[in-house]
Amino acid sequence: MAAATRGCRPWGSLLGLLGLVSAAAAAWDLASLRCTLGAFCECDFRPDLPGLECDLAQHLAGQHLAKALVVKALKAFVRDPAPTKPLVLSLHGWTGTGKSYVSSLLAHYLFQGGLRSPRVHHFSPVLHFPHPSHIERYKKDLKSWVQGNLTACGRSLFLFDEMDKMPPGLMEVLRPFLGSSWVVYGTNYRKAIFIFIRWLLKLGHHGRAPPRRSGALPPAPAAPRPALRAQRAGPAGPGAKG
């Protein structure tokens, strides 16, 4: 039922479709009522994992292992009412492997409003950290942005694009947020999601990128290690929304 409301569904009879729409409308009314009576919705966090699986299966060619790992990690994280770490996902590969598409799907199926949700923060080095000489200010701003938004809502998603272009040392400020401590800087961050996207531009012997094997994941980049491991730990940038 949840998948139907997000647009990924098998088509059935008209009668079945009308019944599905009616059921979805009733469920939406109930959810809206619960949202007004308490903290049921946890900000904009409304995960639709069946819809995500459906969309990945229909529109992401190859990368079978990657799809399985992402869905498995999300299921375990979402179903845990009290996770001990934030969810940290690393999406890395060559152009055309679906990294950006997968990250947009994750935002779409986890948060109402998708990338436009105020709880989804999309960082681009070109837009938000263009001058390496300003690294100390960037560190201060990034730490403040993450801390402030997690204080406002623990269910937040932080998406870092083009990690290979980030100023050296900037991501070190995130290390405290990616561990297993209960509180960092007075903020509970264990329900947050961090996604790191890295483009691999390594060329082969003939000046071309190595061929992509179906279901194969490229080797993980070297640093920063806590940020670039797919693990169960886990802005637009400071001053902007995704």
UniProtKB/Swiss-Prot annotation:
<dbReference type="GO" id="GO:0005576">
    <property type="term" value="C:extracellular region"/>
</dbReference>
<feature type="compositionally biased region" description="Low complexity">
    <location>
        <begin position="225"/>
        <end position="235"/>
    </location>
</feature>
<dbReference type="GO" id="GO:0005179">
    <property type="term" value="F:hormone activity"/>
</dbReference>
<comment type="similarity">
    <text>Belongs to the ClpA/ClpB family. Torsin subfamily.</text>
</comment>
<keyword id="KW-0732">Signal</keyword>
<dbReference type="InterPro" id="IPR010448">
    <property type="entry name" value="Torsin"/>
</dbReference>
<dbReference type="InterPro" id="IPR027417">
    <property type="entry name" value="P-loop_NTPase"/>
</dbReference>
<feature type="binding site">
    <location>
        <begin position="93"/>
        <end position="100"/>
    </location>
    <ligand>
        <name>ATP</name>
    </ligand>
</feature>
<dbReference type="GO" id="GO:0005524">
    <property type="term" value="F:ATP binding"/>
</dbReference>
<dbReference type="GO" id="GO:0016887">
    <property type="term" value="F:ATP hydrolysis activity"/>
</dbReference>
<keyword id="KW-0964">Secreted</keyword>
<dbReference type="GO" id="GO:0012505">
    <property type="term" value="C:endomembrane system"/>
</dbReference>
<dbReference type="GO" id="GO:0043231">
    <property type="term" value="C:intracellular membrane-bounded organelle"/>
</dbReference>
<feature type="region of interest" description="Disordered">
    <location>
        <begin position="210"/>
        <end position="242"/>
    </location>
</feature>
<keyword id="KW-0027">Amidation</keyword>
<keyword id="KW-0372">Hormone</keyword>
<keyword id="KW-0165">Cleavage on pair of basic residues</keyword>
<feature type="propeptide">
    <location>
        <begin position="27"/>
        <end position="189"/>
    </location>
</feature>
<feature type="modified residue" description="Lysine amide">
    <location>
        <position position="241"/>
    </location>
</feature>
<dbReference type="GO" id="GO:0005737">
    <property type="term" value="C:cytoplasm"/>
</dbReference>
<keyword id="KW-0325">Glycoprotein</keyword>
<keyword id="KW-0067">ATP-binding</keyword>
<feature type="glycosylation site" description="N-linked (GlcNAc...) asparagine">
    <location>
        <position position="149"/>
    </location>
</feature>
<comment type="function">
    <text>Salusins -alpha and -beta may be endocrine and/or paracrine factors able to increase intracellular calcium concentrations and induce cell mitogenesis. Salusins may also be potent hypotensive peptides.</text>
</comment>
<dbReference type="Pfam" id="PF06309">
    <property type="entry name" value="Torsin"/>
</dbReference>
<feature type="signal peptide">
    <location>
        <begin position="1"/>
        <end position="26"/>
    </location>
</feature>
<keyword id="KW-0547">Nucleotide-binding</keyword>
<protein>
    <recommendedName>
        <fullName>Prosalusin</fullName>
    </recommendedName>
</protein>
